[in-house]
Amino acid sequence: MKKVFLLMLTLSCFLFGCSSQKDVKEYPSDYPDSSGYGIDDIYYPDNSGQKILSSDIANVNYSHIDQGYVTASLNHKSEQKIKLLIRKGEKSYYYDLINQNPVAFPLQMGNGKYYLGIYENDNYAMKKSLTLDVQIKDELSPFLYPNQLVDYQPGDKITSIAIDIVKKDKNDLQRIQNIYNYVVDNITYDDEKAVEATQKYLIPNLNNIIKNKTGICFDYASMMVAMLRINHIPARLICGDTDVEYHAWVEVYIEGEGWINPDIFMDKGTWTRMDPTFASSKFDYNGKYQAIYYY
């Protein structure tokens, strides 16, 4: 597996590419100031409530679907593979259930009918299922909470780091750039883990990433999304295809602009094509990005 990885931060809209000088936009120097947040302001999923999809192997709490998530946990350790299926229309997300403590899973496909299913064994026999009419109060909510792939808990080191590195910033653009720079400057690409990831699915562990200061594309993206969400900046981890290989990257929501795609980045006061993560790996990528999954 070639040492390339795709953590992309994008800070412009209206363009899906920026390869020519005519595409350059002026930096929005008048972007509105906004107050920062503290440790006590971080959003965490709520596992209270009595709306439970219950089986002998796992439970799914859907009491807070209006906030854009469900929580799920194993009832006991299992030698069998246990999966949670979340489906809306033709789009399906399968998650491994591996924890006896409740973990959040996003309802990121918008309002409408969702199917939840608990499955067991290699053949994934259905244990319990439920169809829900989901109406999310704020469409950005699924991208403001931790979840299985962007997992942080109260007291985790990443929460204090994320708050500290933006404490002098006056607006979200400054916060986004400082978080981006922190991730790129402090994490080294892990070649051995990249090889391991070709053999099995590795869920990002943010505590280990912070401790070891190494990771692969999935880890870079998860860490950056976590730091943004901790600061109330909606962000989503995206997995998909590039011209090189399957990767993970980041999209961020900018007030007044919307979701920003991974082809544009801000460099010293102008909008221009830039990929500092590829740059840090000494790899110049100018290809396409095709999103498949959003987390």
Question: What does each model-identified segment do?
Answer:
Residues 148-212, 260, 268-295:
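Secondary-structure boundary elements
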Residues 219-295:
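Hydrophobic/aromatic-rich core segments of domains that either
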